[in-house]
């Protein structure tokens, strides 16, 4: 089964409540209709009901089964305001500021729906910058217990190379942290291993990569990766991993046997942790464009509830796919 087939199956099983807050965007309305039609999630739309239904009629799509929440006419609005003031107390947020934010920023309102137990996840960003989506997620929802770092992965589907590398590789971090510290690299690896199991359906073999394999080069950049491995060992994580591996040593069995013969994952890694955002972003795009891989992401990880960010150039179909991924992320038992 393809990756998308697996994700759709998990989303159908999960049937989670996913917020799509940017209802002024035609693509979001069309995607919501498709999600409802396929049964991939319980859709929650943020905005004026009359305006949303008018849009659906104009686009000739059905929103039957969607829940529409209007911040201007929401019975729990004051509770939301009070909770947001509590969450942002250290920053001195006033009730008036909280009210204004929730009325004017649907992504923040969507995050509060999750925080208050009225939704399970959110997909946003089609008409707002990544910074707005991540700010709402971090400030309102926060990170998972034991994880301080919000990061991302791309799931790379390489069906044509499955005999060499397997059909699925997980790349992280490719879109959030420019120069991660050792502790952040350890967090990224931990979250990526969890995503590999939950979303990609693979047993993670994690390689923390750099330009050196087992002492072949010396540099502070290499030291940072080695230290990340030490932190993971100290944490006694349950997934297989190794640090200080070059890409060929991580992926190619014959090279791994020469460069890192004692490694538990060399030549067989399927979760690749890049030492910087530059490396990760370049890496996934090279594999996508030159190897013809399908790239699914960025999938945000490390949050206390799933929130995923859309590109402002996204398609309707991609909103559907990312909603299915988010629904699967939100499923505790899946």
Sequence positions of predicted segments:
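Anion-binding alpha/beta catalytic cores of soluble intermediary-metabolism enzymes, centered on
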Residues: 1-266, 271-334
């Amino acid at each position: 089964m393809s990756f998308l087939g697996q994700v759709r199956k998990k989303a159908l099983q999960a049937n989670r409540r996913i917020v799509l807050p940017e209802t002024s965007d035609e693509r979001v309305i069309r995607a919501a209709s498709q999600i409802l039609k396929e049964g991939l999630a319980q859709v929650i739309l943020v905005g004026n009901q009359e305006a949303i239904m008018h849009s659906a009629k104009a686009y000739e799509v059905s929103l039957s089964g969607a829940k529409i929440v209007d911040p201007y006419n929401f019975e729990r609005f004051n509770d939301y305001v009070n909770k947001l003031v509590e969450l942002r107390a250290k920053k001195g947020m006033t009730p008036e500021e909280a009210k204004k934010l929730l009325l004017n920023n649907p992504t923040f309102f969507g995050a509060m729906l999750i925080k208050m137990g009225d939704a399970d996840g959110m997909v946003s960003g089609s008409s707002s910058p990544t910074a707005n989506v991540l700010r709402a997620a971090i400030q309102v929802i926060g990170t998972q217990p034991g994880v301080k770092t919000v990061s991302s992965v791309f799931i790379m589907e390489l069906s044509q190379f499955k005999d060499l590398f397997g059909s699925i590789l997980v790349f992280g971090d490719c879109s959030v942290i420019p120069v991660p510290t050792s502790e952040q690299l350890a967090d990224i690896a931990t979250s990526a291993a969890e995503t590999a199991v939950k979303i990609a359906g693979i047993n993670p073999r994690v390689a923390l990569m750099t330009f050196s394999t087992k002492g072949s080069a010396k540099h502070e950049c290499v030291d940072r990766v080695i230290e990340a491995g030490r932190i993971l060992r100290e944490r006694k994580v349950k997934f297989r991993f190794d640090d200080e591996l070059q890409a060929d040593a991580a992926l190619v069995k014959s090279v791994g046997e020469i460069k890192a013969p004692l490694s538990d994952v060399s030549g067989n890694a399927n979760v690749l942790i890049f030492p910087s955002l530059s490396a990760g972003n370049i890496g996934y795009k090279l594999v996508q464009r030159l190897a013809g891989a399908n790239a699914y992401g960025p999938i945000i990880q490390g949050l206390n509830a799933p929130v995923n960010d859309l590109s402002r150039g996204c398609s309707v179909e991609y909103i559907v796919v990312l909603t299915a991924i988010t629904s699967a992320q939100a499923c505790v038992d899946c």
